[in-house]
Structures are given as structure tokens and as C-alpha cells.
């Protein structure tokens, strides 16, 4: 089988996406080492990878050039690690909710996030998220930066968990067309 430069580029994009798993693992290690700042730095780098890998994949045409690899599944697995598992562990490990809720809230986050990830209507045709999009990494970052009270954190987690099932539109920071000029990166 002949491999051309387009196939190599497609595999390179998949490898770049896959680097998010390594960054997520490093965030996990930082959490277990009680290094909150380090864990957020690793998750921040993973977020940057996630923010540009889709654009690269579309530009390179990975679906055509590497048809046996499913970049959407790869991205979803890594997103679940970095947007759900690591933040839920942070809530538990760094005691961000009141005593007695430290196991319940991460379990709630896992459950509602599983729904988010299997919901085929999670993204609208105009690139919004329908329902809270399971960006728990951002939520936990706000808890950390604002040094919010454990009870406030608990209430926020419950509200966002409920909003997962409410058909309200949430802005996708990179792809929504109507607010594209206000978002971090422009879709090329």
C-alpha cells in the first residue's frame, strides 16, 4: 500500500489530537500530586489542542485521507478525559464541595456528561450546543480562580447538571457562526 503525504498529514492530525490524552494524563498526575496549578496548565494545553485539531482535520481532509480512523471518536474520548474525568476528580481531590457530597457530585457529573456525549442532538445545525455542554474543566477553573465556597460550587454543579437536559443553546466558542468574531479562533 502506497502512503502519500496527504495520508501522513492526516495521521499527523490524529496524532496531534491524541496528544490531548497525554496532556490529560499529565493533568491527572498533577491532581494526584496535589498540584492544582499544574493540573490546570496541562488541561489548558489540552484545551488548546482541542481548539485547533478540528480545524486542522477539516483543512487536511482526514475523513478522506485516513478513512479507517474515526477522529470524532478519538476526540470524544479525549474530551471526556479532559472535560469530565479530570475536573470531577479535582472536585473530589481538592474538596471543592461540602463533606458528604465529595463522591456524589463527581458521580453526577459523570452521569450527566455521559448523556451529553451520547446525545446525537448535542450540537445544533448552527453550531451551538443544546443543553450544558459538559465543559466541567472550565467550571472547575472558575471555582479555583474565584475561590468559591463549597456550597456555591455544589449549587452550580447541580444547576449545570439540570441544564444538561434543558434545550437551551450554549455558544460553541470556536464554531458558532453568529458570534464567531467574539470567539477565540476563527474557523478558516
Q: What do the predicted segments below correspond to?
A:
Residues 104-106, 125-128:
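Membrane-interface helix-loop-helix modules in multi-pass inner-membrane proteins
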Residues 43-50, 109-119, 157-167:
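Alpha-helical transmembrane segments of multi-pass membrane proteins
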Residues 4-11, 34, 66, 70-73, ...:
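Juxtamembrane loop-transmembrane helix junctions in multi-pass integral membrane proteins
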Residues 26-42, 77, 81, 85-107, ...:
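Helix-coil boundary and interhelical linker segments in multi-pass alpha-helical membrane proteins
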Residues 126-188:
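C-terminal membrane-associated helical module and adjoining short loops/tails
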Residues 2-3, 55-64, 114-126, 165-175:
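C-terminal ends of transmembrane helices
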Residues 1-54, 164-188:
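Topogenic membrane-insertion module of multi-pass membrane proteins
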Residues 11-18, 59-116:
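Multi-pass membrane catalytic core of lipid/isoprenoid biosynthesis enzymes
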Amino acid at each position: 500500500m502506497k502512503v502519500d503525504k496527504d495520508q501522513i498529514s492526516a495521521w499527523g492530525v490524529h496524532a496531534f489530537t491524541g496528544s490531548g490524552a497525554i496532556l490529560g494524563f499529565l493533568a491527572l498526575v498533577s491532581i494526584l500530586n496535589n498540584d492544582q496549578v499544574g493540573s490546570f496548565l496541562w488541561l489548558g494545553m489540552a484545551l488548546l489542542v482541542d481548539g485547533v485539531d478540528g480545524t486542522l482535520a477539516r483543512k487536511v481532509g482526514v475523513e478522506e485521507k485516513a478513512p479507517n480512523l474515526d477522529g470524532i471518536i478519538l476526540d470524544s474520548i479525549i474530551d471526556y478525559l479532559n472535560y469530565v474525568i479530570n475536573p470531577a476528580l479535582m472536585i473530589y481531590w481538592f474538596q471543592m464541595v461540602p463533606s458528604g457530597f465529595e463522591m456524589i457530585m463527581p458521580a453526577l457529573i459523570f452521569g450527566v456528561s455521559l448523556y451529553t456525549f451520547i446525545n446525537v442532538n448535542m450540537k445544533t445545525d448552527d453550531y451551538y450546543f443544546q443543553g450544558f455542554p459538559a465543559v466541567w474543566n472550565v467550571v472547575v477553573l472558575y471555582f479555583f480562580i474565584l475561590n468559591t465556597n463549597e456550597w456555591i460550587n455544589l449549587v452550580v454543579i447541580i444547576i449545570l447538571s439540570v441544564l444538561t437536559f434543558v434545550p437551551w443553546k450554549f455558544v460553541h466558542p470556536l464554531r458558532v457562526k453568529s458570534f464567531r468574531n467574539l470567539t477565540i479562533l476563527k474557523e478558516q
